[in-house]
Structures are given as C-alpha cells and as structure tokens.
Amino acid sequence: MNIKETELLFQAGALDVPIIKKHDQGDGWTVTLNGTHKLNPLFETARGQIRVFKRLDAAVGVLFEVGFKEIKTVQ
C-alpha cells in the first residue's frame, strides 16, 4: 500500500499498530501495516515496489506524519 492509501485507511481506523522491521535482503527497514483491509500490508513506493527505508528514523517520521502515535519495531 502506498502513502495515500495509508492515510485514507488510517483516517478510517482500519490500521493496527505499524510494525517496522529490518529488511530481509540487506540494509534498511520495511513497514508492515496490518488491519481490516485487503491491500498488501507492506508499505510501497508510488510504483508498487516495497519501500525500504535506509534509516529507522525516516520510517518512523513518515508514520508520525500519517498520524500514528504508537509504532512497534522488531529485528
């Protein structure tokens, strides 16, 4: 799901606490947005590829901008 879809689902209350985890295929962090929706739960770029954040604080910043108050981080 991309940023626009994330914002809409957040406003509708359809998202759980986001989970940030270390990217499986190298350096960086990915965001999983589970909830009551049928979209791909991984945060994506506008072109549909999985968005990999180089820095953890960048991922957290985007989620705070959407409006999340709580974020879970796992390794």
Give the role of each language-model region:
Residues 1, 25-29, 63:
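Short low-complexity stretches enriched in small and charged residues
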Residues 1-22, 41:
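The feature represents the first ordered module of a protein
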Residues 10-11, 32-35, 57:
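Alpha-helix boundary/capping detector
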Residues 21-48:
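Short aromatic-glycine-(Arg/Gly/Cys) micro-motifs in beta-strand/loop hairpins
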Residues 54-68:
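A short, charged, amphipathic alpha-helix used as a generic interaction element across diverse proteins
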Residues 70-75:
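Short hydrophobic/aromatic patches at helix-to-coil boundaries
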